[in-house]
Amino acid sequence: FDKSCVQDGKFQFGGQEIRCNVLERIDRSQVENGYIYAFHAPNINVDEGESLLAKYYLEVFQIACMDVCRQQIQDYLERKHSVLQKQYCSLSFGPGYYGMDIDAVPKLISFLEADTVGVKWQEDKLYPIMSLVGVYLISKGELLAECKDCAGCLGQAGGCQYCMNR
């Protein structure tokens, strides 16, 4: 998506607005463009008779797969945009992180053909359960260097103005 979609405290995609508080704190003039993504971990069924430990190991494996995927996508986007000059790919902005509300999930999914990669929004949940949706920003410089404390921010309607970490 175009850099004009990145505004003060929000992403604006056509008529849809998605609050993301950290956008109040970054230098938006550095942003070149962005990407919305969705993917899921391998969907492996565990028999009911399996031990609790086996189920735990499977969940840890799925979480590790998603972390690796997110990092691979970030690295790929940074390489892709750094052919002529150095560009940076931000960490993933997503619902529940960097001040983006969980309610952003169905909005982000609606912009993608997520079902082509097996991800869908149904009954107020992402399916499969181990799925992710989010945003990467490509920029001329490091965007989040001074916003490390924002990573776990769940967001609030008032934005960053009342944040004690600001």
Describe the residue ranges of each PLM region.
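Short, hydrophobic/π-rich interface segment
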Residues: 92-145
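Generic structural hydrophobic/aromatic packing signal, biased to beta-strands
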Residues: 37-39, 108, 153
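Active-site helix-to-loop segments that bind/position phosphate- or nucleotide-bearing substrates
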Residues: 1-54, 58
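A generic "cationic amphipathic patch" detector
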Residues: 50, 86, 163-166
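Internal, well-folded beta-alpha domain core
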Residues: 52-114
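Intrinsically disordered, low-complexity, compositionally biased regions/tails
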Residues: 13, 18-19, 98, 122, ...
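Cysteine-cluster motifs in flexible loop/terminal segments that predominantly coordinate metals
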Residues: 133-166
